[in-house]
């Protein structure tokens, strides 16, 4: 049974989902785990390694950490750990922790980025906004507005256009594109290690990480199809689990769900809070985003 904690929005979500007559089944959403709290993405998607270790230890004391396949059959409270995008720190920092604790994880890969040569565009944009804001003495509100303004313009673009947009921003300010160890995507060789690891399940996350609802069916289908074929070539097997990029309720639509069904995924995950039940939509399963907090603030 989870212990009440006023500090934790995460815990409040879990408590609101509990039902004394059925087991609590939830899926947690992570992205990057960094050596320290160096996240500047404006999206709160990175947590420190120390907090991640603490979270796993505390979770293990109170709930079973299982694979998604095991969650579907679970008779007791259970939780699944998922990671989106394909950050290199999923191998370098997360894997040693899950090996030590012997817990399974699922990583959803956006294949376009897996050459290890550039950061994800949202991290590049965050770096740009942070540096420019320091030079111009922007307030936190102004920084947020700048990031959101550029992000809204970038979202509808194709991936190559996204990259060009970012490059133009940096060129305009005579800045170099960053390539930071804590933010870089997996290399192909690193991904292959994860693909063969017994504690890791690899899922699909589109090829280009487009916000699917902004595109028509043909573009959505191609983006997911390319991701599947790329992952098949790298791993030797076809992914059965899918996660919608960005993941909120407006990030995908009925067309997105039909594409995922047509391409033979068994389940698809969103990024809004909720529990998994027999009545859950298999192609819009909820996940709870985990913040950069200590384990005791979770449970």
Task: Report each predicted region and the residues it spans.
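Aromatic-lined substrate-binding rim segments of carbohydrate-active enzymes
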Residues: 89, 97-99
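Generic enzyme active-site microenvironment
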Residues: 82-83, 203
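Glycine-rich active-site/cofactor-binding loop and its immediate structural neighborhood
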Residues: 80-82, 99, 104
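Metal-dependent polysaccharide deacetylase catalytic core of the NodB/CE4 family, i.e.
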Residues: 34, 101-250, 284-285
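C-terminal active-site subregion of NodB/CE4 polysaccharide deacetylases
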Residues: 1-82, 89, 120, 196-197, ...
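Short, glycine/acidic-enriched loop or turn micro-motifs at the edges of active sites
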Residues: 87-88, 208
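A metal-dependent hydrolase metal-coordination microenvironment
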Residues: 83-85, 125
């Amino acid at each position: 049974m989870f212990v009440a904690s006023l500090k934790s929005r995460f815990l409040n979500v879990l408590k609101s989902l509990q039902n004394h007559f059925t087991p609590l089944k939830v899926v947690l959403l992570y992205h990057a785990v960094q050596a320290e709290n160096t996240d500047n993405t404006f999206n709160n998607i990175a947590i420190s390694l120390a907090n991640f270790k603490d979270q796993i230890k505390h979770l293990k004391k109170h709930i079973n950490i299982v694979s998604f396949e095991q969650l579907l059959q679970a008779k007791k409270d259970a939780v699944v750990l998922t990671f989106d995008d394909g950050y290199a720190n999923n191998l370098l920092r997360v894997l040693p922790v899950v090996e030590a604790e012997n817990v399974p994880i699922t990583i959803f890969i956006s294949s376009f980025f897996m050459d290890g040569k550039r950061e994800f565009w949202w991290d590049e944009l965050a770096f740009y906004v942070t540096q420019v804001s320091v030079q111009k003495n922007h307030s936190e509100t102004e920084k947020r507005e700048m990031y959101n303004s550029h992000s809204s313009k970038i979202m509808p673009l194709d991936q190559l256009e996204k990259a060009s947009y970012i490059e133009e921003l940096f060129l305009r300010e005579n800045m170099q594109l960053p390539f930071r160890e804590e933010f870089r995507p997996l290399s192909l060789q690193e991904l292959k290690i994860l693909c063969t690891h017994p504690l890791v399940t690899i899922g699909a996350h589109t090829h280009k990480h487009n916000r699917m609802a902004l595109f028509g069916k043909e573009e959505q289908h191609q983006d997911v199809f390319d991701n599947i074929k790329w992952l098949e070539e790298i791993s030797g097997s076809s992914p059965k689990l899918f996660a919608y990029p960005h993941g909120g309720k407006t990030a995908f639509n009925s067309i997105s769900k039909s594409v995922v069904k047509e391409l033979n995924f068994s389940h698809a995950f969103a990024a809004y809070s909720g529990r998994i039940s027999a009545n859950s939509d298999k192609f819009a399963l909820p996940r709870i985003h985990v913040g950069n907090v200590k384990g005791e603030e979770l449970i």
